[in-house]
């Protein structure tokens, strides 16, 4: 992550902003999660790893002079998004099967939507949006 933030800063205009959104796991679960496997890491995002908010901010501090202007956790709203995605997916099940996908594909993605929705509803997962800038950015708040 350090390299990521270093690259972002090097590409950012002096008075620019950088916005990112990421799914997160609580810091107290991060180390165990990183060393283990689960449904998502096995079937949906192989090789993926959810960061914690602390890991993101630590990497930012270590590799750049960026600062945080705003943080918002929209995870609870993401629950609704996933439920609607699932409903839309299932409403189009016949079309998906007609494309050549099988029932296992349908079950895998239905499980993914419900599994993730439960994580957001229980606040086991977060979905953060963070606005970064540089110290002294006089354009912040001026409508860019």
List where the protein language model places each region.
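A short glycine-rich, Lys/Arg-flanked "PGG" loop and its adjoining helix->strand segment in the class I
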Residues: 2-19
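Substrate-binding/catalytic lobe of Class I Rossmann-like enzymes that use SAM or dcSAM, i.e.
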Residues: 24-140, 144
């Amino acid at each position: 992550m350090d390299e990521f933030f270093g690259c972002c800063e090097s590409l950012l205009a002096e008075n620019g902003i950088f916005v990112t959104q990421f799914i997160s796991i609580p810091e107290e679960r991060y180390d165990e999660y990183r060393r283990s496997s689960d449904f998502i890491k096995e079937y949906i995002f192989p090789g993926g790893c959810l960061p914690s908010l602390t890991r993101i901010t630590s990497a930012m501090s270590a590799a750049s002079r960026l600062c945080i202007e705003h943080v918002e956790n929209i995870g609870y709203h993401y629950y609704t998004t996933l439920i609607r995605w699932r409903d839309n997916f299932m409403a189009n099940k016949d079309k998906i099967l007609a494309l050549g996908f099988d029932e296992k594909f349908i079950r895998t993605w239905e499980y993914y939507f419900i599994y993730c929705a439960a994580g957001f509803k229980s606040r086991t997962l977060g979905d953060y949006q963070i606005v970064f800038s540089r110290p002294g950015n006089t354009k912040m708040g001026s409508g860019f």
